[in-house]
Swiss-Prot record:
Keyword Isomerase among record annotations: yes
Family membership: Belongs to the pseudouridine synthase TruB family. Type 1 subfamily.
Catalytic activity: uridine(55) in tRNA = pseudouridine(55) in tRNA
Protein name as annotated: tRNA pseudouridine synthase B
Record-linked PANTHER family: PSEUDOURIDYLATE SYNTHASE TRUB1, TRNA-PSEUDOURIDINE SYNTHASE
Function noted in UniProt: Responsible for synthesis of pseudouridine from uracil-55 in the psi GC loop of transfer RNAs.
Top EC group: isomerase
Keywords from the UniProt entry: Isomerase, tRNA processing
GO biological process, one term: tRNA pseudouridine synthesis
A Pfam entry, by short name: TruB_N
GO molecular function: RNA binding; tRNA pseudouridine(55) synthase activity
Length: 302
């Protein structure tokens, strides 16, 4: 371990550049902040840009919350050409001259098929594993296996613009959604095939592109400005309801890890003690099923 690394705690929201891997962004940020511990919250493909939250220190304990959070993307689909990976980085495997005449009305009828609860098959070029092997490694070896479908939700699917052979869409979706698969499926529905040529993540959980930093921006900041760019752990849960501890509940929670049933609570809840955020609790119909404590007042801890 590098001497004198800093024990930072919190989240930095990065606007990832194109053609850079998520892991490279993580390592560069860790070096830039001289941080002891850091982790990202789900990879963006190298060709993709946009929101990539990086967790420092204790915030790595809640990375799963961001992995499970809803996401929003802007995607551009090229019609009439299919690739083995479903995006512009793959090899062309099929071409079709039969691109239908596009109109806003026609495309709306197509996109309507993909809103709501959707069954999606992830692409072979993905990090999902088959018998312990990542699918993308099998794909690079020319192997094809049956990939299990998964249930996803597409909350919003909006047509932004289109041309004779392409369309740009905005997608708000649940975890586990592959935009490459969506591009492939839209191309199939149009009868001409298609692949993803551009992808930008505009939101991950509560974090939006407007609050994200480019790595180049952070490199030019002073130490104090870099620290100020770290948002506290509570920011991950800013959209969750708050429960303020009663005085008689504090000993049970802090000393014995107990919490009386709360019939009115369900899902993820922020726990406050004297107007201070101290924990995240998971409730299932009023019963406490999980909790995590945080001391998130200081970004640099001893």
């Amino acid at each position: 371990m590098k001497k004198n690394r800093l024990n930072l705690n919190g989240v930095v929201v990065i606007n990832k550049a194109k053609d850079v891997s998520s892991n490279k962004v993580l390592q560069q940020l860790k070096y830039l902040f001289n941080a002891q511990k850091a982790g990202h919250t789900g990879t963006l493909d190298p060709m993709a840009t946009g929101v990539l939250p990086i967790c420092f220190g204790r915030a790595t304990k809640i990375a799963q919350y961001l992995l499970d959070a809803d996401k929003e993307y802007i995607a551009t689909i090229r019609l009439g050409i299919e690739t083995d990976s479903g995006d512009a980085e793959g090899e062309i495997i099929a071409k079709s001259p039969n691109i239908p005449e596009l109109s806003a009305e026609y495309l709306e009828t197509v996109l309507a098929k993909f809103r709501g609860d959707v069954v999606q098959i992830p692409p072979m070029y993905s990090a999902l594993k088959y018998n312990g092997q990542p699918l993308y490694k099998l794909a690079r070896e020319g192997k094809t296996v049956e990939v299990k479908s998964r249930n996803i939700k597409i909350y919003e699917l909006e047509l932004l613009e289109f041309d004779i052979d392409s369309l740009k869409i905005r997608v708000k979706c649940s975890k586990g959604t592959y935009i490459r698969s969506l591009a492939i499926d839209i191309g199939k529905t149009l009868g001409c095939g298609g692949h993803l040529i551009a992808l930008q993540r505009t939101q991950s959980g509560p974090f939006k592109l407007s609050e994200a930093f480019r790595l180049e921006q952070l490199k030019d900041l002073s130490f104090e400005q870099k620290i100020a760019s770290i948002t506290n752990i509570e920011s991950v849960f800013i959209d969750k309801p708050i429960y303020s501890l009663l005085e008689e509940e504090k000993d049970d929670l802090y000393k014995r890890g107990l919490f009386a049933d709360k019939p009115h609570l369900d899902g993820t809840v922020r726990i406050y003690d004297d107007e201070k955020f101290v924990a995240i609790a998971e409730f299932d119909k009023g019963k406490l099923i999980n909790k995590k404590f945080f001391d998130q007042d200081i970004l640099i801890s001893e």
